[in-house]
């Protein structure tokens, strides 16, 4: 016995307590204490002045009994998952189970189900149930607990309890399987600290809380007009809410220590207390200095009396008296009394009923596979927790609705065939449709199921081929349907080789479609392309039927026939310079030409971005050796870029051209053809020709085009390029740039020259120091996929009209790296990139030929036209060089950039400077048949 009460853990009742309880006969009122606690022993009896033994350990489902002698009340304290200590124990168990991830939703559902089970037991074996709340407000989630308890009682317990209790001592509990409709009371352990603790204030709080609770219980049918059909009962005209306003149940030990410290620090001096006592001793009678007592304030006395009477015991005693007097259920709100349903049992009878109910509702649930003949009870044991998890069912139902809505949204919007991008967009729209309904913890699993169903629907004959084109557009044809030719559905507008006719081109999927087939097709529709003179580029000519593309190793992608590499020291450079001088005096043999050309085509790429300016020796002569310097250094060093037998000097901005001696011309005619080097007839170059590609490999088809579209007179610098001649140019961007080039002709010695040549034609070159002023018109044309064409007047500026053309404008174009891609100035929401597609050249009417050898640097490759002999352009003519539409290395496709920063236009590729040269006119050469031109036909020239 502790103080003035007994306490024990059910069912271990002490003998002496059992004897005392038996003496109560039929006047034992059982009060159940349930609710929340936040102390270590899970004790909710603090307001009653009771506590368990110090060695007590709280457990879920454990019941602690309290009995105060002299009363008729048996207090049954239920320890449940709503106690903070027990909830902490459950969390520790979940954390220790490392194999199962912690799920807060499942954990919360488990806590609630266990509490509902204990609440059901309390509602069946108690007359009064006191719900203890540690907060200052009513917890709305308690309404959910009452709803679940009512559902479980009506749908589960009432299906098997009446039958199973008939053969047990609990049969006296009648068909309702409980002692009565228990009266529910609410105990709030804390009162708002900022409110005055007077009778009026405390009563107001209690009345307001009673109104709130009553409305909630009535609204959710927890309390009805029929007490037998109600889960709980409420008293009529009696208080059922109690606020503990005057007693500090759980004092703050820290604050108490602070108060003790303050009292110690501010304790009055002991001498002052002794002096006060001496003064009081001199008084003639008691009360002379101060009155015997303070005057009594009636209001304060009333508050003190209210504080004395306002205890939880007095609050509970009034309801116990109703039970003992037999008017327990008659006092409920508007409820019809049900005679014979309220029972007061003696101690032994109650323990028998309690044992039966505890076994059925608590003990047996620990074994869900318990053998029983009652199917309803078996269903209760297996599915009780699942039936109470209504949120899970609710969320599952919402997710099912959202899943149906998402699938319908996906299927209704899905076309007959679509690609992965459309699939992702449709799936995103289906996800949004799902989220309009789907909620809760199961939403992620439902979304995964939605994605799986949509993906399966897409792959069921609706998936597109999605083979990427050379412009990175997927093929839109069905994947499962065989098709010989891919089609992305993207249409580009492009011009023909000569630029006169524009047409619609399908998105290319291979190099042949991009760089050859389209231009051959549109040439049949252009009345100019069929008439113009086309330069014939060298292509692969197979000798066997099973020819194939050349294979390139990953580690060594460059196939070289001869020695490669540039001189690494100064001595080697000097030796080569001597060799060049020797070659001027002697005729090169066929073997020397082959070795020299092979070596020159095997120059390694520079590792520095933008500095690989290896001018192909095939383009500028047989003995040219270039360093890996930048383009600016090459422009400033004329002696490294001129070919054998060429003299160049930068004197007064003039280019010096040394005219060939007649003897050398005759010797040149006897030289072998330019392509004397053997080329493969069984393997072809899969990509475009570049500076380090194998010299013996040729492409299957030409990717470049060089055509003479007419005489120079068809271009007027006053009007620019007319629409009927070159269509699609933007306004003001259709002008070529004039380029003035000063030449000084240096002739052979007079005697040797006059001995072999006579005639009027040579008279203007007879005198050394003859000067020529060449006017060349050059245009760098860019074209976007919408067919817009424009010229550029600088590497970073689009030509806006004749006012943009100045004297040095063309020099900025031909002597600088020109970007391969540039943003199109056309007004469009999308940023279309224009590509350098054509180079316009109007040659002068002079006794010289313009030589062109463009080189395009893209990535690690420097692409060339692939011609060993650089093309000579005829005099006084309009020539157009059409560049490749798509660039491809040995086995690597180089796609255009998706976006281009205008501040760094060269990142996508660029045209190297120094593509133009000038050479003496040779009437013996056929410019349109490069195969018949000698090896030195382009060797003697000066680079402009």
From Swiss-Prot:
Keyword Cytoplasm: no
A biological process term (GO) from this entry: nuclear-transcribed mRNA catabolic process, nonsense-mediated decay
Keyword presence, Endoplasmic reticulum: no
Positions with biased composition (Acidic residues): 568-589
InterPro entries: SMG8-like
Assigned keywords, A-Z: Nonsense-mediated mRNA decay
Positions of region (Disordered): 559-601, 629-654
Biased composition, class Polar residues, residue ranges: 629-640
Compositional bias of kind Low complexity: 641-650
Domain of life: Eukaryota
Function summary: Involved in nonsense-mediated decay (NMD) of mRNAs containing premature stop codons. Probable component of kinase complex containing nonC and recruited to stalled ribosomes.
Family as reported in the entry's similarity comment: Belongs to the SMG8 family.
Name of this chain's protein: Nonsense-mediated mRNA decay factor SMG8
Species of the source: Drosophila melanogaster
């Amino acid at each position: 016995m502790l103080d003035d009460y007994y306490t024990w853990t059910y069912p271990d009742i002490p003998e002496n307590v059992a004897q005392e309880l038996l003496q109560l006969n039929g006047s034992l009122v059982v009060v159940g204490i349930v609710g929340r606690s936040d102390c270590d022993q899970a004790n909710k009896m603090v307001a009653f002045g009771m506590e368990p033994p110090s060695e007590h350990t709280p457990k879920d489902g454990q019941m602690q009994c309290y009995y105060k002698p002299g009363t008729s009340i048996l207090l049954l304290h239920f320890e449940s998952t709503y106690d903070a200590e027990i909830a902490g124990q459950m969390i520790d168990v979940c954390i220790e189970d490392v194999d199962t991830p912690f799920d807060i939703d499942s954990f919360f559902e488990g806590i609630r189900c266990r509490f509902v089970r204990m609440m059901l037991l309390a509602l069946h074996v108690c007359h009064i149930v006191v719900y203890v709340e540690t907060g200052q407000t009513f917890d709305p989630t308690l309404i959910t607990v009452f709803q679940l308890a009512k559902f479980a009682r009506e749908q589960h317990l009432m299906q098997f309890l009446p039958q199973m209790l008939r053969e047990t001592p609990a049969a006296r509990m009648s068909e309702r399987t409980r002692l009565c409709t228990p009266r529910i009371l609410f105990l709030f352990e804390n009162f708002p600290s900022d409110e005055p603790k007077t009778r009026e204030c405390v009563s107001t709080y209690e009345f307001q809380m009673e109104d709130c609770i009553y409305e909630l219980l009535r609204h959710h049918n927890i309390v009805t007009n029929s007490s037998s059909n109600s889960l709980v009962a409420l008293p009529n005209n009696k208080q059922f809410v109690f606020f503990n306003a005057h007693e500090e149940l759980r004092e703050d030990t820290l604050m108490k220590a602070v108060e003790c410290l303050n009292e110690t620090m501010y304790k009055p001096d002991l001498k002052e207390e002794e002096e006060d006592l001496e003064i009081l001793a001199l008084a003639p009678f008691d009360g002379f200095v101060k009155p015997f007592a303070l005057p009594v304030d009636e209001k304060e006395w009333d508050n003190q009396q209210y504080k004395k009477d306002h205890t939880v015991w007095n609050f509970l005693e009034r309801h116990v008296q109703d039970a003992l007097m037999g008017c327990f259920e008659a006092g409920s709100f508007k409820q019809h009394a049900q005679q014979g349903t309220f029972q007061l049992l003696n101690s032994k009878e109650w323990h028998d009923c309690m044992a039966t109910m505890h076994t059925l509702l608590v003990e047996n649930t620990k074994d869900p596979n318990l053998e029983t003949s009652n199917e309803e009870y078996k269903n209760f044991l297996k599915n009780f927790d699942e039936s109470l998890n209504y949120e899970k069912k609710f969320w599952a139902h919402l997710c099912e609705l959202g899943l149906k809505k998402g699938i319908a949204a996906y299927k209704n919007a899905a076309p007959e065939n679509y690609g992965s991008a459309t699939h992702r967009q449709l799936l995103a729209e289906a996800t949004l449709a799902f989220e309009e309904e789907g909620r809760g913890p199961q939403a992620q699993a439902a979304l995964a199921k939605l994605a799986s169903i949509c993906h399966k629907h897409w792959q069921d004959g609706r998936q597109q081929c999605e083979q990427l084109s050379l412009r990175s557009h997927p093929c839109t044809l069905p994947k499962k349907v065989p098709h010989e030719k891919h089609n992305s559905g993207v249409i580009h507008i492009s011009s023909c080789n000569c630029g006169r006719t524009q047409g619609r081109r399908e998105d290319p999927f291979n190099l042949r479609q991009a760089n050859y087939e389209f231009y051959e097709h549109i040439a049949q529709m252009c009345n100019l392309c069929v008439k113009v003179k086309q330069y014939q580029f060298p292509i692969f000519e197979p000798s066997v039927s099973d020819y194939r593309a050349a294979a390139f190793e990953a580690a060594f992608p460059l196939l070289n026939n001869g020695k490669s590499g540039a001189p690494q020291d100064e001595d080697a450079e000097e030796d080569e310079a001597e060799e060049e001088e020797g070659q001027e005096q002697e005729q090169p043999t066929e073997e020397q030409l082959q070795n020299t050309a092979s070596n020159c085509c095997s120059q390694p790429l520079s590792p520095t971005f933008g500095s690989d300016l290896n001018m192909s020796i095939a383009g500028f002569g047989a003995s040219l050796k270039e360093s890996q310097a930048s383009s600016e250094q090459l422009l400033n060093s004329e002696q490294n870029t001129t070919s054998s037998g060429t003299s160049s000097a930068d004197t007064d901005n003039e280019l010096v051209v040394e005219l060939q001696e007649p003897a050398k011309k005759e010797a040149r005619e006897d030289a072998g053809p330019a392509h004397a080097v053997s080329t493969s007839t069984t393997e072809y170059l899969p990509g475009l020709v570049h500076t380090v590609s194998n010299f013996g490999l040729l492409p299957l088809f030409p990717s470049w085009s060089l055509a003479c579209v007419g005489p120079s007179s068809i271009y007027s610098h006053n009007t620019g390029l007319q629409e009927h001649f070159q269509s699609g140019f933007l306004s003001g961007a259709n002008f070529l740039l004039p380029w003035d080039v000063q030449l000084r002709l240096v002739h052979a010695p007079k005697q040797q020259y006059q001995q072999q040549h006579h005639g009027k034609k040579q008279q203007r070159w007879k005198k050394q120091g003859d000067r020529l002023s060449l006017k060349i018109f050059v245009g760098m044309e860019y074209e976007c996929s919408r067919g817009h064409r424009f010229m550029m007047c600088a590497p970073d500026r689009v030509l806006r009209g004749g006012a943009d053309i100045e004297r040095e404008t063309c020099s900025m174009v031909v002597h600088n790296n020109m970007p391969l891609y540039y943003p199109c100035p056309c007004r469009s929401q999308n940023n279309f990139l224009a590509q350098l597609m054509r180079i316009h050249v109007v040659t002068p009417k002079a006794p010289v030929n313009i030589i062109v050898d463009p080189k395009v640097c893209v990535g690690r490759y420097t692409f060339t036209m692939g011609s060993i002999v650089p093309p000579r352009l005829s005099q006084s003519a309009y020539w157009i060089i059409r560049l490749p539409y798509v660039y491809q290395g040995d086995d690597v496709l180089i796609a255009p950039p998706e976006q281009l920063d205008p501040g760094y236009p060269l990142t996508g590729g660029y045209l190297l400077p120094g593509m133009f040269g000038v050479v003496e006119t040779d009437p013996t050469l056929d410019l349109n048949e490069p195969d018949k031109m000698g090896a030195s036909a382009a060797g003697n020239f000066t680079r402009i």
